[in-house]
Amino acid sequence: NIACIPTKTLVHEAGIAALLYHDDYPKQANLYKQAIGRKNRLTSFLRNNNYERLSKRPNVTVYTGEGSFVSANIIKVALPEGDIELQGKEIFINTGSTPIIPAIDGIKESQKVYTSTTLLDLNVLPQHLIIVGGGYIGLEFASMYAEFGSKVTLLEGGNRFMPRNDQDIANSVKEV
């Protein structure tokens, strides 16, 4: 609940902000702050609702801990009360993904570098945002923040945007 649904919620809110207050940064920034608040409430609601619904099912046991593979079919889970081992023929990993931070000098020391996750926690709309990466996530964020009123610069290290997608589709998206 930190990526898809919250981002789509903000994309919708950005479209409204662009329609209502196009070229009025202070008003768009205020709508952005409100949208982040609504996104946070939605995320919290979904997380709590999903956890409650799952934990009440008789055939589901929820463990909150750190897991590691012992073998192909066994996972060790470190819990506050001690480690346990869980075994299964098939193991489904659903932890989300970790954003890639490129090897750029000074990037780790900067207090103004955000990932796709941490950017969504900002309560203040950036006046200018530089997005590194021209894949679908970078393009979605560029579009969203531009509609909220930020000046957006998009950088792609490869020879084209959306490098993992069909070139015809990528070219069509670039034209838009």
Q: Which residues are covered by each model-predicted region?
A:
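Glycine-rich flavin
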Residues: 1-125, 158-162, 168-171, 175-176
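Rossmann-like NAD(P)H-binding beta-loop-alpha module
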Residues: 123-165
